[in-house]
Amino acid sequence: MKAVSLTKLDVSRGRMCAEVSIAQGTRDTTPALAARALAEFPSLASHACVNEKGATFGHVIDNTPLPHLMEHLVIAYQMRATLEKKQPPCAKVAGDVDGIPAPADDFTYLGTSEWIDESCGHARITVNFADDLVALRAFRDAESFLNSIVVL
């Protein structure tokens, strides 16, 4: 059984909306899960995020709904793909996104996540994109990554 399953993807101009199913017992992140996610994506902690505890995702990453983590992972995967197209990975310097130097003309990625029916584990995640194929891949990669780090 998978912790996270993409059940529907809709693409409209400049944004992609996914519906996901989250397995019972894995609906929220834990400090251990947050640590595994941050080990692969250190920049998650500094993502801007509207939440009740602070201005960044780092304030809530260890106790937030799993779809919220997936939203930020989709954005992180898009950022990585975009930056890798612009320049090859190299040594980490200030301003990097997980080891890839950020160019001056960054696209601003935005996203939202919400429960459609929390009791059934159904959620909606919406993100904007610069490239629809990159966003589609980002959703698939985020799903795969979460299923590799969530302990059922």
Segments from the language model and where they lie:
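Generic serine detector
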Residues: 5, 12, 21, 43-46, ...
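Generic alpha-helix signal with a bias toward terminal, lower-confidence helices
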Residues: 30-34, 81, 86-87, 137-139
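A common structural junction motif
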Residues: 30-47, 141-152
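M16/MPP (pitrilysin/insulinase) zinc-metallopeptidase core fold and M16-derived inactive scaffolds
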Residues: 41-127
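M16/insulysin-pitrilysin zinc metalloprotease superfamily fold
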Residues: 121-152
